[in-house]
Amino acid sequence: MKASVVLSLIGYLVVPSDTAVLGRCVVAKKLHEGGLSDFEGYSLENWVCLAYFESKFNPMAVYENSRSDFIGYGLFQIRNHDWCDHGRNRCHMSCSALLNPDLKKTIECAKTIVKGKRGMGAWPSWTLNCQHSDTLARWLDGCKL
């Protein structure tokens, strides 16, 4: 009896840390529906790869890099200095809008970023992990779009 009470109490105290994490195929579908398939010449696989290496598919991720003095927001860890209202606001939106699991604002801002001269190279993680990968197709394996 005591053990079940203790386990029940522990169950109330433990909050899953990955509740906001989306599945790979869910991310692929949302990005596809948002028009990122072949946007500016980048395949959907590139976008899914980027999302994984930036946030592990967590649309509510916030990462503060105190060394470089920036904060990254959302699925693509969009940086505050240039893209949202805590900086130059080139995407014309609040940084908190980038934390919505529906991904609409995130996709809108990502399109603005990738139209720039650096394209997806604006994300160092894409350059390191996705750009020349010969296994990009795996990011869509088993996904129904």
Swiss-Prot record:
<keyword id="KW-1015">Disulfide bond</keyword>
<dbReference type="InterPro" id="IPR023346">
    <property type="entry name" value="Lysozyme-like_dom_sf"/>
</dbReference>
<keyword id="KW-0964">Secreted</keyword>
<feature type="signal peptide">
    <location>
        <begin position="1"/>
        <end position="19"/>
    </location>
</feature>
<feature type="disulfide bond">
    <location>
        <begin position="25"/>
        <end position="143"/>
    </location>
</feature>
<dbReference type="GO" id="GO:0009566">
    <property type="term" value="P:fertilization"/>
</dbReference>
<feature type="disulfide bond">
    <location>
        <begin position="84"/>
        <end position="95"/>
    </location>
</feature>
<feature type="domain" description="C-type lysozyme">
    <location>
        <begin position="20"/>
        <end position="145"/>
    </location>
</feature>
<protein>
    <recommendedName>
        <fullName>Lysozyme-like protein 4</fullName>
    </recommendedName>
</protein>
<keyword id="KW-0968">Cytoplasmic vesicle</keyword>
<keyword id="KW-0282">Flagellum</keyword>
<dbReference type="GO" id="GO:0007342">
    <property type="term" value="P:fusion of sperm to egg plasma membrane involved in single fertilization"/>
</dbReference>
<keyword id="KW-0732">Signal</keyword>
<dbReference type="InterPro" id="IPR000974">
    <property type="entry name" value="Glyco_hydro_22_lys"/>
</dbReference>
<feature type="disulfide bond">
    <location>
        <begin position="49"/>
        <end position="130"/>
    </location>
</feature>
<dbReference type="GO" id="GO:0005615">
    <property type="term" value="C:extracellular space"/>
</dbReference>
<feature type="disulfide bond">
    <location>
        <begin position="91"/>
        <end position="109"/>
    </location>
</feature>
<feature type="active site">
    <location>
        <position position="54"/>
    </location>
</feature>
<dbReference type="GO" id="GO:0036126">
    <property type="term" value="C:sperm flagellum"/>
</dbReference>
<dbReference type="GO" id="GO:0003796">
    <property type="term" value="F:lysozyme activity"/>
</dbReference>
<comment type="subunit">
    <text>Monomer.</text>
</comment>
<keyword id="KW-0969">Cilium</keyword>
<comment type="similarity">
    <text>Belongs to the glycosyl hydrolase 22 family.</text>
</comment>
<dbReference type="InterPro" id="IPR019799">
    <property type="entry name" value="Glyco_hydro_22_CS"/>
</dbReference>
<comment type="function">
    <text>May be involved in fertilization. Has no detectable bacteriolytic and lysozyme activities in vitro.</text>
</comment>
<keyword id="KW-0966">Cell projection</keyword>
<keyword id="KW-0278">Fertilization</keyword>
<dbReference type="InterPro" id="IPR001916">
    <property type="entry name" value="Glyco_hydro_22"/>
</dbReference>
<dbReference type="Pfam" id="PF00062">
    <property type="entry name" value="Lys"/>
</dbReference>
<dbReference type="GO" id="GO:0001669">
    <property type="term" value="C:acrosomal vesicle"/>
</dbReference>
